[in-house]
């Protein structure tokens, strides 16, 4: 149960310590080394038709588009969280800190989240023991007892993506913009994804920060993107 408080979401623009110069793009065709269309991939076959989810029933579901998530939530009597709800839950009661466990990425050298170790995308060191997604509860929970709010896989939230929304949004419990707008691809409907994934690291996306946000095409599914449901307290009160 997440306490009802002011819900305010953030992004890289509010993170004074983040240096965009550290986002290296000097690798030859670096984007294409990381991403490739794989015919036949779906949630039952995450990396292609010859793969399966056997032995991964305790991993997050992936390769689902935004509307897949909506339909599952509807079937389960739940819903997707708003971006603000998601961030508040992610912080686990620790306001003003970079990560849901504090400000140090590896306290006492301990891995707190499933992320990429080494230089992305050319050097994968696998120091945390996972090449891709990890079973839920592989890493410590946050202050609210929630697992994998940072890393493992990105998570769809309900909000349309608009980069300037928080310049004019309500300060309390913002519900997201009424329409999608990505200046780089204005004709494509996009929603927000949060939390980062096993592909994130300090020279790539740092998506495991509490305030990090990503935009995703609603028709796009990926091996590193899933979702979680929420339920309103009024739905469970007798």
Regions found by a protein language model. Name each.
Residues 2-210, 214, 218, 223, ...:
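Functional-site microenvironments in short loops/helix caps that host divalent-cation chemistry
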Residues 223-236:
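Short, structured beta-strand segments at or near domain termini in extracellular proteins/domains
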């Amino acid at each position: 149960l997440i306490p009802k408080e002011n819900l305010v979401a953030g992004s890289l623009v509010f993170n004074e310590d983040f240096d965009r110069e550290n986002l290296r793009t000097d690798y030859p065709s670096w984007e294409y080394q990381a991403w490739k269309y794989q015919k036949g991939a779906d949630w039952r076959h995450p990396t292609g038709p010859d793969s399966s989810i056997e032995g991964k029933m305790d991993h997050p579901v992936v390769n689902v588009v935004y509307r897949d998530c909506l339909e599952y939530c509807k079937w389960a009597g739940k819903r997707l969280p708003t971006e603000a709800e998601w961030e508040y839950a992610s912080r686990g009661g620790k306001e003003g800190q970079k990560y849901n466990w504090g400000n140090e990425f590896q306290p006492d050298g301990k891995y707190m989240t499933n992320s990429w170790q080494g230089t992305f995308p050319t050097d994968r060191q696998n120091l945390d023991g996972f090449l891709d997604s990890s079973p839920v509860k592989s890493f410590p929970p946050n202050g609210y007892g929630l697992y994998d709010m940072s890393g493992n896989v990105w998570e769809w939230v309900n909000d349309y993506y608009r980069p300037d929304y928080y310049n004019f949004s309500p300060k309390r419990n913002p519900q997201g913009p009424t329409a999608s707008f990505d200046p780089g691809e204005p004709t494509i409907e996009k929603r927000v994804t949060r939390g980062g994934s096993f592909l994130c690291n300090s020279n790539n996306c740092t998506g495991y920060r509490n305030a990090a946000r990503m935009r995703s095409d609603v028709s796009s599914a990926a091996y590193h993107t899933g979702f979680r449901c929420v339920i309103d307290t009024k739905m469970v009160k007798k």
